[in-house]
Amino acid sequence: MAKSALVWLASVCLVFNILSLPFLALGLSSCGGSCQTLNDYEGQLICINGECNDDPEVGTHICGGNSSTPSPPPPSTCQPSGTLACKGGKPKNTYTCSPPITSSTPAVLTNNNFEKGGDGGGPSACDNKYHDNSERIVALSTGWYNGGSRCGKMIRITAQNGRSVLAKVVDECDSMHGCDKEHAGQPPCDNNIVDGSNAVWNALGLDINIGEVDVTWSMA
């Protein structure tokens, strides 16, 4: 009798363990649940910083925005192509590319004189003309200028004070060349520059004497 009872008890335990397995797996793969290794999840979730979350490489959205752990941003693929140093100056990186353009692209706004004899050097690359600084116009870093494909197009620039302005692309802020007469002796531009006229700075309510400020921009 005792032996039969033990057999019955063992059978019950076995059935309970089998029935518990799906719930255990579900618990391990729950969004936001704790985990320690990549094996602590099932399906298309991944262990990120000790939490089960969507796998950014797979592109799943099972967890949605419930997890406190954001997906990591894609790595930047824009790397320097070389260096160039003006006489007596330090070497600067040169670029053929710029960061990806988004609906709110981070950039550095600088000030440029588009008039003849100004610090912009030669005439604007888009139309081979000089422009009055009262125009709301900009030059874009080489990668964003993209061989002139954005010439004449409008972009929206937004400052950190909340003000924004529409400006027309008329020139390239050369990230590859510099230190010569064509570039007014200036070194190459960084790869994240929006070089704006006085009118752009004034419309944004910014002090031109600051020289450069962080902004965002997008195609209008």
From Swiss-Prot:
<dbReference type="Pfam" id="PF24300">
    <property type="entry name" value="KWL1"/>
</dbReference>
<feature type="signal peptide">
    <location>
        <begin position="1"/>
        <end position="27"/>
    </location>
</feature>
<dbReference type="InterPro" id="IPR039271">
    <property type="entry name" value="Kiwellin-like"/>
</dbReference>
<keyword id="KW-0964">Secreted</keyword>
<dbReference type="InterPro" id="IPR036908">
    <property type="entry name" value="RlpA-like_sf"/>
</dbReference>
<comment type="similarity">
    <text>Belongs to the kiwellin family.</text>
</comment>
<protein>
    <recommendedName>
        <fullName>Ripening-related protein grip22</fullName>
    </recommendedName>
</protein>
<dbReference type="GO" id="GO:0005576">
    <property type="term" value="C:extracellular region"/>
</dbReference>
<keyword id="KW-0732">Signal</keyword>
